[in-house]
Amino acid sequence: MARKEFRYRGYTLEQLMNMSLEELARLLPARQRRSLRRGLTPEQKKLLRKIRLAKKGKYNKPIRTHCRDMIILPEMVGLTIYVHNGKEFVPVEIKPEMIGHYLGEFAPTRKRVQHGAPGIGATRSSMFVAVK
């Protein structure tokens, strides 16, 4: 079975690429639409400039950013952006399904807790067990 072509609210990726930010904002959910209408912050503009240069092939270094609140736009699709999670830069490969989400959603800030085996004294019943 062939893979279904990606569409965002009925528009193909090519159609989304040709849209202006204002036209794209109309398709996004309210929070993202409101954020785009307020305008991009200087950090977001700097990141967008780097992304556009990388797409043209003029920016060779990996794109690293602390800007977790940047909305993923169609022009970012296909790039790998390194997003800071508070400790290190996590590589995020942008796919068409991510359009409209924030970069920070794909770089978790907290590690999942992995508990080891409980030690002596961890439970009431193991308090009085001889240690050897």
UniProtKB/Swiss-Prot annotation:
Example GO BP: ribosomal small subunit assembly
Gene3D superfamilies xref list: 30s Ribosomal Protein S19, Chain A (3.30.860.10)
GO molecular function: rRNA binding; structural constituent of ribosome
InterPro entries, A to Z: Ribosomal_uS19, Ribosomal_uS19_CS, Ribosomal_uS19_euk/arc, Ribosomal_uS19_SF
Matching Pfam families: Ribosomal_S19
Entry keywords, A to Z: Ribonucleoprotein, Ribosomal protein, RNA-binding, rRNA-binding
A single Gene Ontology CC term: cytosolic small ribosomal subunit
SUPFAM superfamilies assigned to the protein according to its UniProt record, in alphabetical order: Ribosomal protein S19
Its biological purpose: Protein S19 forms a complex with S13 that binds strongly to the 16S ribosomal RNA.
Family per record: Belongs to the universal ribosomal protein uS19 family.
Identification of the protein by name: Small ribosomal subunit protein uS19
Gene expressing this chain: rps19
